[in-house]
């Protein structure tokens, strides 16, 4: 007999339901989590056997959307879901980031979380309820987990914070912020805004964290009622004797190695020291656990770096805590691209290119919440050579997709409207060197490359990564962190924006105890750093170039009567196909009669515009036109005076004299002047040649619109 255990509660304007005990009973834990009609089935499976050789925590989070959730059958040949979409990968990261820090240190058992979207209300994004479902499932599983956590989306509409706004609400929101944390601490923030102040952003974080307490309390209540027995985990004992020996032998040398400013030289020295220590202890005891030595060595490194920072000594590369690394900025570095830049900050470097295309180049996205077209693409590539390593080069990894999305969100607030700049824009950031903050270097480089391409962005955007080292009540905030400072520190806080305010923010915190005041100071320090970088960027390129690249397509817009669209397209697309081939342009037609003509050579575009105007010109009764004879019949001749515009010259209208045989006077393809006598209700034209002869014709009175 199935005995469901259900917890239902109100969360803002939505009803949350958490149900367990019916489905997937062989999983370690399973929860059906729903927010109104949007439901996500979340399972957790943990491996109870510990792999002693495992050096990292093997947590896998999979988020998968099923099209049956919205009553659709998948497209494609196989008619089933395939590889995860970009949105699925990003949502999986959103679930992973706040829960990963909450597992005990040294816990290396394999854990897999699968969140399957099984029902979707088109007004409710499944991401928030997915995080809540994962938190609930982990809390029920018995797996060591310092949760539960809550999650909230915060919008900013009419100068008010809105909890978990609907999709329609988000259309008028100046903020899209997701915050997740425990009862006492914020652990993760992901935000995009339309240039809001630091105070507004901090207020949204606090609002979201406060509101999600109801979620945390209800998960606790569900856990008290239905959780499994906690796992009994034995963690490897610390070999204090070995730690003391290695510390005594290597601490001073490791400390000296961290006085080497160059990353590669420092790593070479540290690797040499580590190998020497391993050789020494291995010669004394061939059964010694090498991974244990490596762990102790890393622990000593961490203690040295953190102690120096907390004592206000210089950082790894010799900087003070608020100092930004040296900047080198260049634009127009790739001659045949539409826009480019090379942004270097210390040992982090991004080569950014911008490509302008037409609406045909836009990406069509088939998503559960509705199909949409994306005219702004941002791709971030992190090749192994950027950190001096050898690796597999292939499709983008989760991290690359996540960094690309963050950089894209940083720029959205300043991008021109499609009506004002009708181009599809693709930005590619190639990370050629990396030592921390490569995503923020991509933002800076992309802003410069857009201006180099002549894209009329509203203002320049820069990004900065802040770090934190905290022990007890003592803490130090770091500006423009290195890769090691990110790895050994307690927080990675990325902020991007303009001179006026923040456009995007991403925060991941590894510890509890980050107060509102610490976040406020971090935001203000990030602002100072951002303004400094923007000032240097302004010296390199202060505003968008006046014209787009000579190699970029020029897009010209004209408007025609929507009823004339069929004439431009022609039967089976024959006319538009002929126009594109003969003029060498790309022609796109919208339902409202807007036509976009794109070509890299201006004369080609002008030719296409002239041809379209000829096709769509209104035929007027009494006007004289130059046309071409297309057919001859016994009772007259058909004359084309434009594509799709053919009229009849009756035999009686060919000449003032009697005509016995039409072919005696006219031949096919002959160019002839005709006068429009009548347009009947069906749009058919009655033409005359003899009326032209009876008229006084000037060159200007003839409309040469034959094709």
Swiss-Prot record:
Q: What class of enzyme is it?
A: transferase
Q: Taxonomically, which superkingdom?
A: Bacteria
**Family note:** Belongs to the polyribonucleotide nucleotidyltransferase family.
> What is the primary gene name for this protein?
pnp
Which SMART domains does the record match to this protein? Answer: KH, S1
**Gene3D superfamilies the UniProt entry points to:** GHMP Kinase, N-terminal domain (3.30.230.70), K Homology domain, type 1 (3.30.1370.10), Nucleic acid-binding proteins (2.40.50.140)
Instruction: Extract the GO molecular function terms from the UniProt entry.
Output: 3'-5'-RNA exonuclease activity; magnesium ion binding; polyribonucleotide nucleotidyltransferase activity; RNA binding
Q: Where is the KH domain?
A: 553-612
Q: Does the keyword rRNA-binding apply?
A: no
InterPro entries listed in its UniProt record: ExoRNase_PH_dom1, ExoRNase_PH_dom2, ExoRNase_PH_dom2_sf, KH_dom, KH_dom_type_1, KH_dom_type_1_sf, NA-bd_OB-fold, PNPase
Q: What is its EC number?
A: 2.7.7.8
Family annotation (PROSITE patterns): KH_TYPE_1 (PS50084), S1 (PS50126)
Question: Where does this protein chiefly localize?
Answer: cytoplasm
Task: Tell me the function of this protein.
Answer: Involved in mRNA degradation. Catalyzes the phosphorolysis of single-stranded polyribonucleotides processively in the 3'- to 5'-direction.
Does the record carry NAD as a key word? no
Cellular localization per UniProt: Cytoplasm
Domain S1 motif: from-to ranges: 622-690
Q: Which UniProt keywords apply?
A: Cytoplasm, Magnesium, Metal-binding, Nucleotidyltransferase, RNA-binding, Transferase
The protein's annotated catalytic reaction(s) are: RNA(n+1) + phosphate = RNA(n) + a ribonucleoside 5'-diphosphate
Q: Tell me its cofactors.
A: Mg(2+)
Instruction: Quote the Pfam families the UniProt record gives.
Output: KH_1, PNPase, RNase_PH, RNase_PH_C, S1
GO CC term (a single one): cytosol
Q: Which GO terms describe its biological process?
A: mRNA catabolic process; RNA processing
Q: How does it assemble?
A: Component of the RNA degradosome, which is a multiprotein complex involved in RNA processing and mRNA degradation.
User: Record-annotated residues binding Mg(2+)?
Assistant: 486, 492
| Entry-linked NCBIfam families | polynuc_phos, PRK11824.1
The protein's name is Polyribonucleotide nucleotidyltransferase
